[in-house]
């Protein structure tokens, strides 16, 4: 799934569809950041990032915590994610 695939869900009048789209977007972004960090750590980037790996890892940790919050809400609210 790509970010563009989540657009219909984000535009839906149904909050459960918007919720699912938000979860999907965050998951996609977190996975891409995780891949980026791995490539950064192993010198596989074609450029030198300005941000430190530590700051990017902090961002990823927060994104993962946000994903966990959304998963807990999904259970409570009966929204199917993943």
Residue ranges: model-predicted function:
Residues 2-82:
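Extended, charge-rich alpha-helical interface modules
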């Amino acid at each position: 799934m790509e970010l563009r695939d989540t657009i219909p869900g984000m535009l839906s009048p149904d909050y459960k569809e918007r919720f699912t789209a938000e979860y999907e977007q965050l998951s996609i972004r977190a996975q891409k950041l995780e891949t980026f960090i791995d490539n950064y750590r192993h010198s596989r980037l074609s450029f030198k990032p300005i941000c430190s790996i530590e700051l990017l890892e902090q961002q990823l940790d927060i994104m993962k915590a946000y994903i966990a919050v959304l998963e807990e809400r999904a259970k409570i609210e009966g929204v199917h994610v993943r």
